[in-house]
Amino acid sequence: MDKQNIYITTTLPYVNAEPHIGHALEFVQADAISRYFRTKLGDENVFFNVGTDEHGQKIFNKAKEEGLSLNDFVDKYAQRFKDFCKLFSVEYDNFYRTSTPAHHDAAKIFWKKCEEKGDIYKKQYSGRYCIGCERYLTEKELVDGKCPDHKTVPEIKEEENYFFRLSNYRGPLLKWLDENKDFLKPESKIPELRKIIAEIEDISISRLKENLPWGIEVPNDPEQVFYVWFDALTNYVNAVGFGTDEKRLSEWWPVYSYVVQTI
């Protein structure tokens, strides 16, 4: 195998509850891949990232329920996940936390880059909001009027939020999929994925700060905070230098990479 950088990352678990066996499976799988490539390429060519997702409505509610400040609450559960990794002898290179100032700064840089490309706009929106999912659900996603995952009736909310023009990427994503048919196994699932991509809609990426004070403030708009998924997903590039160390970023991204995700 030729020498190359291998970047391995798990998803970032939410810190609204204790670690569980599903997290262990993901951490251990990623650790096994990391160890394998270290034997082939050496430690210097492998970077293994784990961490915790620490913003959003569920965390805000849970901290209030436990009578803790938000910072104390996320510190407590981030440490639980660190201890959990230690329990399973998971040897990561970086434990990434989305509540840190460094993450906030990098996420804001990412927002501004999206804005400069014309991918962000603001509009009034009304929809069915599931607190458990922390997102708006469409009519066709509901089962008997309820969220299929949380079995609750979504709240009807009306807000002015920022949206990401995800619909602009239907064409490029379909083209990429056509050119990389070995991306998905089994190939019989490609038509299903094509259908999902063809139906992509723009997504809400902010929330009113008066309703959710625990989040990253949107650049140049103190009344809005990042929607938790939009800020958390930037961790994968932030962890290897986006917004802070462009030289390091160029060494690890884009590279031959593994994203290990078990849900």
Features from the language model and the residues they span:
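Structured secondary-structure scaffolds
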Residues: 1-43, 47-50, 102-106, 157-263
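Short, charge-patterned binding micro-sites
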Residues: 52-58
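Glycine-rich loop at the start of a catalytic domain that most often binds anionic cofactors/ligands
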Residues: 59-66
